[in-house]
Amino acid sequence: MMKVLVVVALLVTLISYSSSEGIDDLEADELLSLMANEQTRKECIPKHHECTSNKHGCCRGNFFKYKCQCTTVVTQDGEQTERCFCGTPSHHKAAELVVGFGKKIFG
């Protein structure tokens, strides 16, 4: 019986050592991933900024990613150009309002 306990203890030690090595590798990969996400977060376009040249580069808001909203602008010369900005669509605003109201009621 004592031999079985020694073998089990040895197996548990080996498994915990090998899994800790795997966790260290995983943490290093996660750190690199977080650094990459931070870099893309810095490169995204904030709310109310122009996104005419990069319509899919808007940052994330509290709940949703901002959408590039475009409008046609007529210059003084009579030329029409498209101008876009990152903003929150009305249906996202409504959803955020409902969620905020629900948080106030239910804590």
UniProtKB/Swiss-Prot annotation:
Keyword Disulfide bond: yes
Cellular compartment(s): Secreted
Keyword Glycoprotein among record annotations: no
Protein name in the entry: U1-lycotoxin-Ls1n
Propeptide: 21-41
Chief location: secreted
InterPro entries cross-referenced by the UniProt entry: Spider_toxin_CSTX_knottin, Spider_toxin_CSTX_Knottin_CS
Organism of derivation: Lycosa singoriensis
